[in-house]
């Protein structure tokens, strides 16, 4: 099953691509339930329809606030499918009032996991925690990469302070479509003419603290990166 926000380009775009790929691979989508920004305060109807359809996995291409509502509602009704989301769900453990134990087994695709043991990630996490007192999620990592990729594009194309906005824009477009960038959210990243970035996704799953020999991104849960 799928629950998505039809009023949001991010959510509806992923839904459309997922639906096409599922059909190509012969996977059955037993139900696809939509909501909009105007009626997202109560998603019990969408959850109930997935449950009635017998969906064993529910794909959630949505943001963490709405995802927390769905997991809470499913728990109240005894519905226990596998929930799988995307990078917009990163941050669900920080939703005020959300019972984080409900995130056990939740899987999502995200370009960044704060538990990663590479030197670049750990240096960023340490500096971020020292500055802001909390663990960064993928939104923070994306913002970091935006700034430093732009910096690289500026250096490689020779942008100067005396250029006007349109000149700088054209230079940056040239830079992004011709360079390769190594950042927190991926290595060897490239951009096409439309601005779409190419990088490998990471699939992670929330594990209870102590359930695996893993560093914990945010107790009581760990981010366990799953191999592709």
Regions found by a protein language model. Give the residues of each.
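Extracytosolic ligand-binding ectodomains
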Residues: 1-228
């Amino acid at each position: 099953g799928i629950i998505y926000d039809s009023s949001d380009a991010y959510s509806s775009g992923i839904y459309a691509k997922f639906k096409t790929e599922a059909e190509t691979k012969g996977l059955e989508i037993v139900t696809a339930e939509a909501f909009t920004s105007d009626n997202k305060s109560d998603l019990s109807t969408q959850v109930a329809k997935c449950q009635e359809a017998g969906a064993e996995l529910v794909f959630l291409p949505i943001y963490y606030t709405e995802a927390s509502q769905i997991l809470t509602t499913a728990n109240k009704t005894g519905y226990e499918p596998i929930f799988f989301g995307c990078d917009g769900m990163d941050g669900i453990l920080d939703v005020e009032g959300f019972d984080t134990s409900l995130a056990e087994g939740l899987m999502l695709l995200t370009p960044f996991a704060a538990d990663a043991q590479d030197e670049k990630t750990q240096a960023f996490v340490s500096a971020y925690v020292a500055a802001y007192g909390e663990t960064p999620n993928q939104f923070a990592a994306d913002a970091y990469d935006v700034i430093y990729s732009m910096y690289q594009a500026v250096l490689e194309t020779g942008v100067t302070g005396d250029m006007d906005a349109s000149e700088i824009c054209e230079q940056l477009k040239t830079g992004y479509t011709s360079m390769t960038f190594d950042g927190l959210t991926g290595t060897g990243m490239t951009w096409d003419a439309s601005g779409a970035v190419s990088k490998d996704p990471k699939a992670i799953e929330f594990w209870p603290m102590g359930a695996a020999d893993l560093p914990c991104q945010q107790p009581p849960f760990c981010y366990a990166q799953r191999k592709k």
